Amino acid sequence: MESLTLQPINLINGEVNLPGSKSVSNRALLLAALAQGTTRLTNLLDSDDIRHMLNALQQLGVQYQLSADKTECTVEGLGQPFSVKDFTCLYLGNAGTAMRPLAAALCLGQGEFELTGEPRMKERPIGHLVDALRSAGADITYLENEHYPPLKIKGTGLDGGEVSIDGSISSQFLTAFLMAAPLAKSDTTILIKGDLVSKPYIDITLNIMAQFGVQVENQNYQKFIVPAGQVYQSPGEFLVEGDASSASYFLAAGAIKGGEVKVTGIGKNSIQGDIQFADALEAMGAEIEWGEDYIIARHRQLNAIDMDFNHIPDAAMTIATAALFAPGTTSIRNVYNWRVKETDRLHAMATELRKLGAEVEEGDDYITITSPTQLKHVAIDTYDDHRMAMCFSLVALSDTAVTINDPKCTSKTFPDYFTKLEQLSR
């Protein structure tokens, strides 16, 4: 297995222009494909997850032109749901942002489809979404294990009506249903069962739907009303914001070992909830400056915090490694959905932090980290999870080197992450 050893970094300073957001890129690509008109997307993320979505759209008859650097894509909208004559098998790797929304969208049109992916995708639950889609008239069959991909979908249209979705495991189930609902046969009312996790990701979905001309009534995240008969209309141009989850590593680095680090491509008006990571860093003691299209983090002594991170679970992972630099015990609470991500992130994070010498308690939906006085040089296993690799790169901001196993797993969202980190390192 390939590995990368990062030597201790004395100072972090400089500016990073962020790659496009994964969450925004795949939502916008899907809506551009369904929309009337042609959409030019700029600052598109070039990564594995986006490639899986683009390949799927191509198989579904969508025509697009991708620039040489793959960050600009012009999509010819179909102006209607996907319909294919022949049985179509779509391979989606481990891209939840492709699997879940496509599962809902393919119910709308005509044709028979199989949705599958790599082994980890077959361990990531999709039952709550399938239950909701079936209650709206969808014809979906599990091909292997109940409640998990791969799926067989027979497109017959969605009826609409009143539907319940369990929101406690993943907000992507609700996102998927919301994006399909305007094209259902009648108005859809979606009722949320349980506590909805990752609410800011629903805000991203509703914001992008609005940019494509579709309105949804959101009643306090407990009830969503989507009128039928709406049509997605291309906005013409669509700028993909920088990825706020990816910003977290650089902002944390600035807080731990700045100088200062400026990330551009997101700012105080971003539609991504993960910019609230900067507030968590500020709570730990970092100095944060907000601009229209940038955020700056400057070094200050960090302190341990105890916080609920249900709203920003992805960025909360970065707090777990930043906690190594904050004397005391940091508690990251209400993050059960770490367990159903690219890997079981609670278990993976606890295991690797302990290797470094931290004292860790792993609960069902929380983790506490007591920072050690001295970090050990160890090889970090990354579990084929891009965020594990990027989070643990921060260990090099100590006086100890760190070895990252399988560093190329960052290709899921940020293929040149380690190059960018090196450019800021002194």
UniProtKB/Swiss-Prot annotation:
Keyword Transferase appears in the UniProt entry: yes
EC nos: 2.5.1.19
PROSITE patterns xref list: EPSP_SYNTHASE_1 (PS00104), EPSP_SYNTHASE_2 (PS00885)
Subcellular location: Cytoplasm
One Gene Ontology term from the biological process aspect of the record: chorismate biosynthetic process
Superkingdom of origin organism: Bacteria
Substrates-to-products reaction catalysed: 3-phosphoshikimate + phosphoenolpyruvate = 5-O-(1-carboxyvinyl)-3-phosphoshikimate + phosphate
Pathway: Metabolic intermediate biosynthesis; chorismate biosynthesis; chorismate from D-erythrose 4-phosphate and phosphoenolpyruvate: step 6/7
Disulfide-bond pairs as recorded: none
GO annotations of cellular component type: cytoplasm
Positions annotated to bind 3-phosphoshikimate: 22-23, 27, 170-172, 198, 314, 337, 341
InterPro entries, per database record: Enolpyruvate_Tfrase_dom, Enolpyruvate_Tfrase_sf, EPSP_synthase, EPSP_synthase_CS, RNA3'P_cycl/enolpyr_Trfase_a/b
Family (UniProt): Belongs to the EPSP synthase family.
Subunit-structure text: Monomer.
The protein, known as: 3-phosphoshikimate 1-carboxyvinyltransferase
Organism: Photobacterium damsela subsp. piscicida
